[in-house]
Amino acid sequence: MKNHMKKILVIGETCVDKFIYCNVNRLSPEAPVPVLIPIRTTSNPGMAGNTSANVTVLSPKSVILGLNQEEDITKIRYVEEKSNHMFFRVDEGETNTLPFRWTAEVDVMLGEADITIVSDYNKGFLSNADLKEIAYKSKLSILDSKRRLTNDVIEDFSFVKLNELERINNPELINDNIITTLGSRGAEYKNTIYPSPKPQETIDVSGAGDTFTASFIIKYHQLKDERVAIKFANRMAAEVV
């Protein structure tokens, strides 16, 4: 008998994360702004694309499925080389995102997926109704969303991952399976703090939240232990900051 090959479905907006690293040694004589001299440029998948990249590393023997928007989105960050301080970001291509389309194939993918990860960056691709339907049809699911959420939207998700600011902005949520990431302090789940193994303050432009989400749900699927999965996700997220 062949071993079952795990299927992981990642749904959400993708982008290209471009980082332009610069030397910054002086102010402009024309205005009180720094002069940035580009040194090097790197590009990698961002948003749900970063989540998929993490899944590929964490579970290399799995089948990775993706449902993403058709339009190209690029986030260009100008970063000071020595300090890793980001001066500003330029976003391109996110103004005309077409909405998610339900098809028979989508239903099949949801039915076959062992894990469904929703990386919702609130760019117009997914609606509240889409989120509810995805959660209802998924076996094991986690939502990482940047929108204002309601209890009826999240009630059927196995887990919901929010950062600290997102949790503050959603005070009415009562789902017991909300995990709140706390940056350098780790994560909170059911009123218990799980400290980060690297508690120092950092400037994060690396998508550590996507890493946490993917790491947590994959480890939870393996062991069915929230505490162990959160500790593992904390370690993985700390490595990319």
Q: Predicted regions span which residues?
A:
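A short acidic-Thr-Gly-centered motif at the start of a beta-strand
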Residues: 1-5
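Conserved N-terminal subdomain of the carbohydrate kinase-like
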Residues: 6-11, 16-117, 128-130
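Generic beta-sheet signal
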Residues: 11, 65-67, 144, 163, ...
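Active-site metal-binding loops of divalent metal-dependent hydrolases
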Residues: 13-14, 121, 211
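Conserved beta-alpha-beta core of the PfkB/ribokinase-like small-molecule kinase fold
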Residues: 25-27, 31, 78-96, 115-172, ...
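Short hydrophobic/aromatic-enriched beta-strand-loop microsegments
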Residues: 62-63, 158-164, 194-196
